[in-house]
Regions:
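Conserved beta-strand core positions
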Residues: 5, 44-45, 137, 184, ...
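Conserved SAM/AdoMet-binding glycine-rich loop
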Residues: 77-83, 88, 93, 178-304, ...
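Active-site proximal loops enriched in glycine and acidic residues that flank catalytic Cys/His/Asp
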Residues: 188, 224, 252-254, 290-294, ...
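Extended hydrophobic-aromatic, low-complexity segments
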Residues: 246-247, 260-261, 284-287, 302-304, ...
Length: 435
């Protein structure tokens, strides 16, 4: 009888893809896989960790300790750990948590299966076990990052940027379409750098255009672009291809030249304003999601005022913000004193988010009375929950449609009349099924 393996995936969607790849390999080798179990159901547990920021490290360590206790109590047989945390802190972790049967990094996790299976190991690249609802999936197009922003530990963990071969990505898309996937959320640590490590040129627009031309691909959504040397031909693809969502996730981090220089972002205030302006001009209706940081070392009141004015001007449809926290080994940790008091960081964070909350409420209210294409994700209580092309899974607003109104099908598209809005969610009524 085959053993059951629980894969516990922590952190970002890029980690989730790694977990799904491992699950596909496990199943091809005769194991039954479950995922994200609160109560371990399998004889073997694999924890895929995140090591990006302190909160993520704590979550990863606590999860490992939880399953180490389960092993001590005899509720599971074996415990393995993989991912970013073990990639960065392997020696310390091995010493501190001896209950773990095997430690694997971010890139050698396939060795885990070889160690379990021995000579009978079967390789089957590309056969992912999708853990999201079947109608959408994440497509990881590269690993690593060459940008070396002052505050970021990602290059220390994942190394240099490595683009996946374009045909390999397109083959994966075709395979997922055959499995029922309609929506593809393209992810990378630095999306717009795709291809540079191969031949010195950015090929992201070419890749997305070819994905859009693949039969069965209904939506493509782009995540984690970078403002420096932004490839403007990508905007043409977003504008012209109907199945490329008018949505772009691009972390801008700050606007003052002082902060951008200290952060080693290699972009200026003027260039950032021009980038946002061109996005709005070349792709009418585009929804921009960005991430900002407050409290970086040396941030003055004047720097923060510039940031507030930028947010008011840009009117981002989606925005997240974080207070700076020092990450060991990064340029900022080694070169700068963390000199902005915690209470000032929190105050600035609260202020910038209040500005954005008002903007978000106003922009969502403008959708009332419009008919939008919505994909249905799930039934929850009295409502079917869906998303428009402007909404990425997990992080963006959702559309709530009364379940009593009509029987909708999970994973199908409907034209929905938006009838009301809240700060982060919309309410609607179905007009017609579109796909």
């Amino acid at each position: 009888m085959s053993k059951t393996i629980d894969i516990i995936s922590l952190g970002c969607s890029k980690n989730l893809v790694d977990s799904e790849m491992l699950m596909g390999l496990m199943e091809a080798n005769g194991y039954k896989c479950t995922h994200d179990s609160d109560d371990p159901q399998g004889e073997i547990v694999v924890v895929n960790t995140c090591g990006f920021i302190n909160d993520a490290k704590e979550e990863s360590i606590n999860t490992i300790l939880e399953f180490a206790q389960a092993k001590t109590e005899g509720r599971i047989e074996k415990l393995f750990v993989m991912g970013c945390l073990s990639e960065r802190y392997l020696a310390d972790l091995e010493q501190e948590i001896p209950e773990v049967d095997g430690w694997y990094g971010k890139f050698n996790y396939k060795k885990l299966l070889k160690d379990l299976k021995g000579e009978d190991f079967v390789a089957c690249e590309g056969k992912r076990h999708i853990t999201t609802p079947r109608h959408y999936a994440y497509i990881k197009i590269s690993e690593g990052c060459d940008r070396h922003c002052a505050y970021c530990a990602i290059p220390l963990i994942t190394g240099k940027h490595q683009s996946r071969p374009m045909q390999e990505i397109l083959d994966e898309v075709k395979y997922l379409v055959s499995q029922g996937t309609k929506e593809f959320n393209v992810i990378a640590q630095e999306l717009t750098y795709y291809g540079v490590d191969i031949d010195g040129k950015q090929h992201i627009a070419e890749l997305i255009e070819k994905m859009a031309d693949t039969e069965g691909v209904e939506w493509i959504r782009l995540h984690y672009a970078y403002p420096t040397h932004f490839p403007f031909d990508l905007l043409r693809v977003i504008r012209e291809k109907k199945n490329v969502c008018k949505y772009l996730d691009i972390a801008l981090q700050h606007i003052s030249d002082n902060m951008l220089t200290r952060m080693r972002r290699h972009v200026t205030k003027e260039e950032t304003y021009e980038l946002v302006r061109r996005m709005r001009e070349e792709v009418p209706g585009i929804h921009i999601r960005t991430t900002l940081m407050v409290g970086f070392p040396g941030e003055t009141d004047e720097d923060f005022e510039e940031l507030k004015e930028f947010v008011k001007w840009a009117r981002f449809e989606r925005m997240g913000a974080f207070a700076y926290s020092e990450e060991e080994g990064t340029y900022s940790a080694e070169q700068f004193e963390d000199d902005v008091p915690e209470e000032v960081k929190q105050s600035r964070l609260d202020k910038i988010m209040r500005i954005q909350q008002n903007i978000s409420s106003e922009l969502e209210a403008e959708k009332v009375g419009k008919v939008l294409k919505v994909i249905i994700d799930r039934l929850e209580g009295d409502y079917f929950i869906g998303r428009t092309e402007f909404c990425s899974p997990e992080v963006d607003p959702e559309v709530l449609i009364p379940a009593a109104e009509a029987k909708l099908t999970i994973g199908d598209f409907y034209d929905v009349l938006i009838t009301d809005s809240e700060e982060f969610d919309l309410y609607g009524t179905t007009i017609i099924k579109t796909i």
